[in-house]
C-alpha cells in the first residue's frame, strides 16, 4: 500500500497504522473518531453511530462534520443549499439507498435529524462545535 511506503519514507511508520474497514466494522478503541462529510451517505447511520460509540473510550469524542443545512427546506433555498440538494439527489441519496438499511439522509439532513441519528446510536450528549455556510461540526459524547 502506498500509504505505508510514504509513512516509512517519512520516518513515522512505527507510530501509525493503516486499516481498511467499513464504518461499522473498524477495530480499536479511540479518544477521537472523526467523520468528514460521510455520515449522510451511509445506509445505516444509526448502526454506524452505535459502532462508533462502542469504539470510543469513556471520555472519547466523535467529531461529525456534515454539509450545513437548516432543518426546514425553506432554510436551504439559497445558492449553497441548492447546490447541496442537487448533488445530494444525484450522489448521496442513491449511494445510501443502495446499502444495508438505506436510510438515505442526504446532504441536507439538518442538525436536528443528525442529532436524532447520533442519539439513537447511544450517545448522551451532542453539541454544535462550529458552523460555516458550508459545514456543520457536531461533537458527540458517550
Predicted regions and their residues:
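Helix-to-beta-strand junctions that scaffold the AdoMet/dcAdoMet cofactor pocket
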Residues: 12, 42-43, 56-57
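A short glycine-rich, Lys/Arg-flanked "PGG" loop and its adjoining helix->strand segment in the class I
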Residues: 46-59
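C-terminal alpha-helical "lid/dimerization" subdomain adjacent to the S-adenosyl-L-methionine
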Residues: 65-121
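A short SAM/SAH-binding and catalytic strip from SAM-dependent methyltransferases
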Residues: 31-46
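A short acidic, Gly/Pro-enriched loop at the edge of an enzyme's catalytic core
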Residues: 21-33
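Conserved SAM-binding loop
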Residues: 3-4
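Core SAM-dependent methyltransferase catalytic element
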Residues: 117-142
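Conserved SAM-binding strand-loop segment of SAM-dependent methyltransferases
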Residues: 10-23
Amino acid at each position: 500500500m502506498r500509504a505505508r511506503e510514504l509513512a516509512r519514507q517519512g520516518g513515522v511508520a512505527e507510530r501509525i497504522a493503516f486499516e481498511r474497514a467499513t464504518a461499522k466494522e473498524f477495530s480499536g478503541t479511540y479518544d477521537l473518531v472523526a467523520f468528514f462529510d460521510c455520515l449522510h451517505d451511509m445506509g445505516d447511520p444509526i448502526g454506524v453511530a452505535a459502532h462508533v460509540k462502542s469504539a470510543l473510550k469513556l471520555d472519547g469524542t466523535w467529531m461529525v462534520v456534515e454539509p450545513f443545512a437548516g432543518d426546514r427546506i425553506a432554510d436551504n433555498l439559497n445558492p449553497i443549499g441548492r447546490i447541496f440538494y442537487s448533488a445530494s439527489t444525484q450522489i448521496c441519496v442513491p449511494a445510501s439507498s443502495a446499502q444495508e438499511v438505506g436510510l438515505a439522509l442526504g446532504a441536507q439532513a439538518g442538525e436536528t435529524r443528525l442529532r436524532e441519528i447520533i442519539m439513537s446510536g447511544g450517545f448522551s450528549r451532542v453539541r454544535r462545535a462550529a458552523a460555516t455556510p458550508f459545514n456543520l461540526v457536531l461533537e458527540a459524547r458517550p
